[in-house]
Amino acid sequence: MKTMKKLWILMAALTATLLLCVISASACTMVYVGSDLTDDGSSFMARSEDYSNGYNKIAHVNQHGKYAAGSVYEGCYGFTHTFTHDSYAYTATSDDNISGVCPDCGQTHPHTPMEEVGSNEKGVSVSAMVTLSPNGAVVNADPMEDLGICESDMATILLSEASSAKEGVELLLNIFDTVGAGEPSGVLIGDQNEIWYVENFTGHTYTAVKLSSDMITMNPNMGAIGLVDLDDTDNVLSSANLIEVAKQAGTYEGSETENTIDVYKSYCAYANGSPNTRLVNGLNYFLASDTLSASTIAPEDFTISNVKNGKVVSLYTNIQNKLGKISIHDMVDYYKVDDIANIGNLEWHIFQIQSADAPETGTIEWLAMEHGQYSVAIPYFPSLTTDMYDGYKFGGEEATTTDTAPADPYGTYAFSSYWGSGYVVLPEGWENGYYWTVDALSNYALSDQCSAEDNALIHSELAKVQQLCYDKAAEMKAALADMSGDEAKAYATGQSAALAQQAHTLTLELYKHVVSHEHTYGEWETTTAPTCKDEGVATQTCKFCDATQTKSLPKSDGHSWDDGVVTKTATTEADGVKTYTCTVCQATKAEAIPALASDAGSNAPASEPNPATGDSANLMLLGAVMLLSVTGTVFVVKKKILVK
């Protein structure tokens, strides 16, 4: 979710661009599922990054040492950080500043804004962040820091520096303690050993919890940590002032004597209101029903706690799962749930972390662009990925808006927002960008112009490629078990890029089909075979409908001959003739039948020209022996002469 600072800057600008399409600054949705609840023992940590319709994202790999030890990183809004060592290599998905001008802060100094998500060479994965909504009283008691760390900086710093999830947590908490936060956030930091969730609602307060293997938690910008006992320091880390700030604000809920605090009720603005629809729909998704509503959900139904019946227990939530063992398919479908999937989705990602696997294959990062219902999640093995598909790296140009309906709807769509309405015109060459292609398809599919039949077609075709990705991830993992070094990196990078290209190509083909009625034809198939008399026909059929196109095939050079008939009988004095007729054009060809041998009982000499037995054979053999004898004699004589 995008920083509030950025939103206010964008609103103040009032430019006639896609900024008019901003739907909400608080629409990211995070979810975690512990390994005890999954079908393969993986843990899942995931989030959608939501901000605006039509706001390009790019994905890339930052190479080891991009930031040298001692160099200073300057973020969008004044936060700086001095690197303690050469930065680790890591994957990232950032806002599009390819033009050299940051779309978030408008500055030109080198930085990678809103990298949001990635995994580094040490196996540390970060999803940063979900913006939270603090109550006004706690912010007054502990204000945000103007130069504090923001969403725009978090993933960059943590992935560059941290060699473990715990080290990443400690680094972030130290920044909160010393520099402070520029905005409230919820951050996931994990590796193969543990996954942590960190919340801060004010400038210097925070709570971090180590998520357990038998729980589900989610946070659609509401906050997720409820009643916690701060003495459980193995699993709960908090700022020294966490209780004190809430007391100063007059919002503290908990027990000082027991060192407990209900973070949600003490700090979150939602504590005094109703849960949003994304929480309701997300809880119902795991229940496989629609039984819950905003009016029936209490904070205790979804917040994280380590207190039960007055005692410290393992961290848990009361979120119920009726899906059975949860698979990657279930996690992808979570981001297709209404409202969780929305036009503000910029990208969404799922980390599938398997603690028992080798470090190279223990983490799979599933990355999808744009609207959850119209995109495909592509699997990557981030520690082996050295580059990203080119379609993720297209950028540098922004979409524009116009009040006039374009004559050709291709590459455009209508929008309506609080600030106005009009038409979006995608940037030149947008077909080369994976984000823009999904943006075009999803906006058309959600419009009144798209028929129910076309919508069903889109979902059906995308589902086929998504299934291919599930199958391919398993295939890649098995293949990588027998690879190492550069071979493994080349294979993993190439296979993931090929899947992304296939999904991108399909998305563009679907868009052209439903918008411009262009057909994508399959292979040529011979539907009428050519003959010696007539040309044949080959047909192509559209992948998405029954439309066909044909072409002629040249006449065949050959004939279809029958079994033939003897038209002249062979005799002892003359050859015979067998005649064949083409069954298509009636052409004929003749074949000689050898003359018959003479009768065996006649007085004529034998007819065999070269008998294999008898006197002639013996004479030939005798001649050969004599020839060899003479040759041998000559050889011996010559040899003797040479010796002399």
Residue ranges and their predicted role:
Residues 516-604:
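Extracellular modular ligand-binding repeats in secreted and cell-surface proteins
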Residues 297, 301-401:
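Long, well-ordered mid-to-C-terminal structural blocks that present hydrophobic/aromatic surfaces
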Residues 28-150, 171-301:
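A contiguous strand-loop segment
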Residues 628-644:
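C-terminal membrane-anchoring or membrane-association module
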Residues 369-374, 382-516:
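Charged low-complexity "KEKE/polyampholyte" interaction tracts
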Residues 604-621:
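Extracellular Ser/Thr-rich, low-complexity/disordered mucin-like segments
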Residues 2-11, 637:
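Bacterial N-terminal signal peptides that target proteins for export
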Residues 11-22:
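Bacterial N-terminal signal peptides
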